[in-house]
Swiss-Prot record:
S-S bonds: 21-27
Cellular location(s): Virion; Host nucleus; Host early endosome; Host Golgi apparatus
Family note: Belongs to the papillomaviridae L2 protein family.
InterPro entries: Late_L2
Lineage top rank: taxon: Viruses
A biological process from GO: viral penetration into host nucleus
Major localization listed first in the record, in broad terms: virion
Protein name per UniProt: Minor capsid protein L2
Species per Swiss-Prot/TrEMBL record: Human papillomavirus type 6a
DNA-binding as UniProt keyword: yes
Record PTM text: Highly phosphorylated.
Motif Nuclear localization signal location, chain numbering: 1-12, 442-450
Keywords in alphabetical order: Capsid protein, Cytoplasmic inwards viral transport, Disulfide bond, DNA-binding, Host endosome, Host Golgi apparatus, Host nucleus, Host-virus interaction, Late protein, Microtubular inwards viral transport, Phosphoprotein, Viral penetration into host nucleus, Virion, Virus entry into host cell
Amino acid sequence: MAHSRARRRKRASATQLYQTCKLTGTCPPDVIPKVEHNTIADQILKWGSLGVFFGGLGIGTGSGTGGRTGYVPLGTSAKPSITSGPMARPPVVVEPVAPSDPSIVSLIEESAIINAGAPEIVPPAHGGFTITSSETTTPAILDVSVTSHTTTSIFRNPVFTEPSVTQPQPPVEANGHILISAPTITSHPIEEIPLDTFVISSSDSGPTSSTPVPGTAPRPRVGLYSRALHQVQVTDPAFLSTPQRLITYDNPVYEGEDVSVQFSHDSIHNAPDEAFMDIIRLHRPAIASRRGLVRYSRIGQRGSMHTRSGKHIGARIHYFYDISPIAQAAEEIEMHPLVAAQDDTFDIYAESFEPDINPTQHPVTNISDTYLTSTPNTVTQPWGNTTVPLSIPNDLFLQSGPDITFPTAPMGTPFSPVTPALPTGPVFITGSGFYLHPAWYFARKRRKRIPLFFSDVAA
């Protein structure tokens, strides 16, 4: 292993060492003579300069610069150097000015005043000036009457034609003869020119009419499987009806399955389903087919981060639940409408059942307007497995074969007087309840129209 050589640190200059070690007396022996210019070379120059004068050659211990003028090559003359700097102004000679005459001015006498070229003063004459005017006896009255101008314009109207030109009126004379003049304008036959259809055949696929039929725009597709959405499959059936149970506990904000759901989390909590953690919004559902399946989808918005302005930042997730596969039926089954029966029909393929009992021994119940009586004696008979229609009471007996009229016990007249009697034993009322008509078994439910696209989600 090669050892790296230590980096050599630069020694301080002699001037820096002199400033710190002069006071303490710890300077190296070569620092003080160099700074104070007391080296051997300095001493030789000092002693040799007593007998030899070198001028401005600049010979010394400093760097060799050749003096102020620099080195000059041999055999050439030195060029004059031009120093840069502010140019000195030429000196201005100041001449002193001394008074040659005294500054006292003597007064001049009045007789010495000469007014040369001055205008003479004319004394003003008393009186006014005359005004010459022409004598005019006519008063200055201006004629301000309004001058009327008449403008006549003639234009030609091709629509209007004077009737006297086209067809003159017949003159009438008073001599007893009526003369009727024929019109001077004769009619000419009108020439009929057949109109030709001007058709231009063109290969351009332009509009063939003035008002073309607008085309149908393609339906926008919902981008549920883009890279911006994270795909999560939900297996809980509650996602179809009450998705709020998978996010929060008893959230009253939820209003229905076909609207967007919003959630607000005031504190840190765990969602009932980990896949719905930090969800703040569920968009409207959409039902579509995906690879042979009926798929129920919703887009959720996470609120992982929020800024000071209140804006939430988070990922968007596509939750989907596969309801059922779409497969071809193994066989076609004809469906019959379930309607009310119009006549009495019996199942001829039902199991034969012939009870060995006299119909007259069956308990008969008499229902009157006011009283209800029943015979206390009853006959118990075991029942067999019989197919009975829903619209027929179970107190009638069915028998395979054609329609059979069963004998019935004669009913009492409701107008005959009936003496009420107290029952001596327990009362058994044989009968059945009511049967709902088959047409009312399946009540009509209002179908909710679920849109196949998200109305509040950008595709």
